[in-house]
Curated annotation (Swiss-Prot):
Binding site for Zn(2+): H296, H300, D309
Keywords on record: Hydrolase, Metal-binding, Metalloprotease, Protease, Signal, Zinc
Function statement: Heat-labile protease.
Record text on cofactor binding: Binds 1 zinc ion per subunit.
Active site: E297
Name the UniProt record assigns to this protein: Extracellular protease
Lineage start: Bacteria, Pseudomonadati, Pseudomonadota, Gammaproteobacteria, Aeromonadales
A biological process term (GO) from this entry: proteolysis
Amino acid sequence: MMKATPIALLLAGVLASPLCAAGLDARLTLVEGSTDDVRVNLTLTNTGEKPVRLLKWQLPGSEDAPLFQVERDGQPVDYEGALIKRAAPSDKDYQLLKAGQSLTVQAEVSGLYDMSAQGQYSIRYLLPTVAQEGKAAKAKQAQASESNAVTLWVDGVSDDRVLAKAAVAEPQAVSASVSFSGRCTNTQKSDILAALDAASGIANNSSSYLAVDKPNGQRYRSWFGAYDATRWNQAETNFSKIKDAIDNKPLTFDCGCKQSYFAYVYPDQPYKVYLCKSFWTAPVTGTDSRAGTIVHELSHFNVVAGTDDLGYGQANARNLASTDPQKALNNADNHEYFAENTPSEN
């Protein structure tokens, strides 16, 4: 497995901008200092004598849309964002750009296009034509046009697990691969892969611990309660499946969640994990870590351990272990804290 490397912006060439129709000039520049993720500034200027109406969803912003032409080494790069069905535009869907007025917006391109592979990239903004419906408007609608192209070298996220997803034709045959959705940036992809490596480490450690019965093991007692052979075997099975999911299954991580919690999954939809705000601020390892979050979420899948959320936090998890060990075996946080093992216990 190759280590994920940051993007190196070694070249930011700006080519000549084509003349834009309807008096609209589109200028694209790279954002300085974006060393891990590719961000661009788009400046639109109405060079005509009349106002121009721009469809808001044709401007880079919070909503996904295939607004850029991205190529790597001369070959088109896949758009990975959402494709949205919309109603016909109404007045509220337009933004007015007066004569002589400019508008600058920023876009994070590597979150919407597959820029994980190393190579020479070019990026160009495209403003498609949308037919005007209804009566003629006082302001002209912007017609099809494009910006200049910016070019840059990208080191990419070089990881065998990411590349594996493109090498397999049959979905059921995919193994040990990682894919991304929800506008994951290259920084986020690298962070996820680092967390996944750490999750693999603590899952392996947990499986090794459970491979030999330890009736007096304090680590087990803290998180799964008093020793019982049947429950011990169940814990061993659960972690064997968690380890297998990390090592051998096609994992998908979605970065689109804006909620304050750590992550969530749909138990009957393996192996997709939705990562939220608290995940990104958590440490890689330790209590309530990124690695532990991955273990927690994978345990929820019905094909893994089918755990529930019966109590959150170490205090509640310890209480479950001491008062109802069977429920502790069904609680995702108990699996997470057993795997994280902080503070360390034997």
